[in-house]
Regions:
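Bacterial lipoprotein signal-peptidase II cleavage site
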Residues: 21-40
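Beta-alpha junction/loop-to-helix N-cap segments that form part of ligand/metal-binding clefts
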Residues: 69-76, 91-159, 169, 228-235, ...
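Extracellular/periplasmic periplasmic-binding protein-like sensory domains
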Residues: 265-334, 388-390, 394-396, 400-405
Length: 406
């Protein structure tokens, strides 16, 4: 019933038809170049590195570690896009080829790999990484080399402005975190005193900072806030601290560690209502938490509407290849490949790194996750809905219209 109620609201954002491969040119500004390129780098950038029969794209993703689910989702979804594009004739007579490397979710590892891609003239653009922290660590590298780094998921608002070569399509924590405070917790859940537990990373601190600012503005009290480092396993002391503050709701700001935190909260005997910002509608979260996640509320800019046949077909193909249900994260990853394709199709002349960057900034495209048009900074604006877990399944609680002011 909820899905039928939201059908109209989702029509724009969940558009996916067999014309997914088409796009129309738009206009978008972009920040000025922030570094001077060396003569050697500039010459390579302006040359045609795609002279052969393939266009190579570098992929950075956490294939191992806490966020491995999302990294594998990247890999599967991007390969799906490449396979379809190549089967349909490629782009300008050339085939796409992916070079996938495991960043492990580690900033130094990601930067080392980004440097390898940047130094390889055959790599025409970089897709990834998953975390904002990794993407931000790579910004100076891609800026110096003059190569696009298009992240499916980086949402720290400080990332894209770091270089004219940095792009992201997830949306921004400067929008999602305030939505979680004002609409999910205060308006929908009726929260007055909340506890916050968040990952101490570039993404996590940005999410918390934006959440905290919004909470102060709307009079939502933060009873206690705690944070932890990447790959933490034992959250018992943090849970004890939150519990002692007696919040009426707890929100978790993270992706990979959310199931562990939920399980440890419930096994401690605490039945506080829970919310999360970050994991999306992850089926692995449900499988790893079982009844512990029943009633969990989450923010999401996207939902797989079972009434959308094309979207369902995409989802089914992903499941057959990945072995798990997709969230918005692999859907965004799929879209990034088509964004590069669309940019290349618009190039009049040699396919170069710089030409890809310039045409990417102008793209106006509708993909799996809905309309995509870059701001001057190289990120996009998204709307958000409230989803929840009922009887072991995700449902829409409130759609995009919920945040519209009367």
């Amino acid at each position: 019933m909820l899905l039928k109620k939201m059908k109209a609201s989702l029509a724009v954002a969940l558009v996916m038809s067999m014309s997914l491969l088409t796009a129309c040119g738009g206009s978008a500004g972009k920040k000025a170049d922030t570094t001077e390129k060396s003569g050697e780098t500039q010459a390579a950038k302006e040359g045609n590195a795609a002279e052969g029969g393939t266009i190579k794209l570098g992929v950075l993703a956490p294939l191992t570690g806490t966020n491995a689910e999302y990294g594998k989702g990247f890999q599967v979804a991007m390969q799906m896009a490449v396979d379809k594009i190549n089967a349909d004739g490629g782009v300008k007579g050339k085939k796409f080829e992916l070079s996938v490397k495991d960043s492990k979710g580690d900033q130094k590892e990601s930067s080392d790999l980004a440097r390898q891609f940047a130094d390889d003239d055959e790599i025409m653009a970089i897709l990834g990484d998953f975390t904002s922290g990794c993407c931000m660590a790579n910004a100076s590298i891609v800026d110096e080399a003059g190569i696009v780094q298009l992240s499916p998921t980086a949402s720290n608002p400080d990332y894209a402005p770091m270089s004219k070569y940095c792009f992201s399509i997830m949306g921004l924590q400067s929008a999602e975190a305030p939505f979680a405070a004002k609409y999910l917790l205060q308006k929908y859940a009726g929260a007055k005193n909340v506890g916050v537990i968040y990952i101490n990373s570039d993404w996590g601190t940005s999410a918390f900072s934006n959440f905290e600012k919004a909470a102060k503005e709307i009079g939502l009290n933060i009873a206690a806030s705690v944070n932890y480092v990447q790959d933490e396993k034992d959250f018992s002391s943090l849970i004890t601290k939150l519990k002692s503050a007696n919040p009426d709701h707890v929100i978790i700001l993270d992706q990979g560690a959310v199931p562990q935190i939920i399980n440890q909260i419930r096994t401690s005997g605490w039945d506080v209502p829970l919310a999360a910002l970050g994991p999306g509608t992850s089926e692995q979260l449900i499988s790893q938490t079982g009844k512990n996640s029943e009633g969990l509320l989450i923010t999401s800019p996207f939902f797989f509407d079972p009434e959308n046949k094309e979207l369902t077909a995409w989802k089914d193909e992903f499941v057959s290849k990945a072995g798990f249900q997709p969230t918005i994260h692999p859907a965004c990853a799929y879209d990034t490949v088509y964004l590069i394709k669309t940019a290349i199709e618009a190039i009049d002349g040699d396919i170069t790194r710089e030409a890809i960057r310039d045409k990417l900034a102008e793209v106006d495209y509708t993909g799996v996750t809905g309309p995509i048009k870059f701001t001057e900074n190289g990120d996009i604006n998204r709307q958000y809905m409230i989803c929840g877990i009922e009887n072991g399944q995700y449902v829409i609680k409130e759609g995009f219209d919920y945040s519209k002011e009367n």
